[in-house]
Amino acid sequence: MTSRFTELAVDCHDPERLAAFWCEVLDFKVIDRSEGKVEIGSWVPTVEDVRARQMPPTLFFVRVPEGKAVKNRLHLDVSPIDGSTEDEVTRLLGLGAAMADVGQGSDRSWVVMADPEGNEFCVLRTLAP
């Protein structure tokens, strides 16, 4: 018996705002929305596709009443594909991200940031040639 990683759910205050932010970051599209929920992805999942092979998971933003209180136990890592890490950090700041300090120190090869609701994520070294 096997399970597939199909989506990552993110509790948040404003699903529309976070979905829009992450669509810009990852070049994803909104693939489903309902009251208090927005799902984004790089593809429109079907049961047949997911059964046939491992596919990239979607991000599912769900409105919850409580706010974020502590550092995330799970976070996303992103890697720029067509520019430098520094240029990507600048772009993400322009989209509404913020720099974050989780005790990582300044001598790291990655940059810790937070999305507009304070969820930490890391920008890793570029994959650009």
Q: Which residues fall in each region the model found?
A:
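Residues that flank catalytic or metal-binding motifs in active/ligand-binding sites
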Residues: 4, 36, 57, 72-74, ...
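Domain-length accessory/inserted modules outside core catalytic folds
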Residues: 1, 41-42, 46-47, 54-71, ...
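Core segments of cupin and vicinal oxygen chelate
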Residues: 11-56, 94, 102, 107
